[in-house]
């Protein structure tokens, strides 16, 4: 068995974006359960409806995509985006102080 060297192109990140209805009590429960399931599976909240998870390999990413698909409630929209570690490293996060300046 050969060991493949880890690099920024084999390590993956998963983003889960969602817009779930929360009008009824059942919808609120389903949305909260979806979030809890994401967190139990190792996802971290990046923004309120955006969760992110590090995956050490492409195979690991595939496993977590299947899990997310199993968590999806019957209503709403859920999107999954996978990016390499190299691509993830190019994310630009704008500090709050900069966004506040643009509002003045």
Task: Give, region by region, the residue ranges found by the protein language model.
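Basic nucleic-acid-binding interfaces
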Residues: 2-15, 20-104
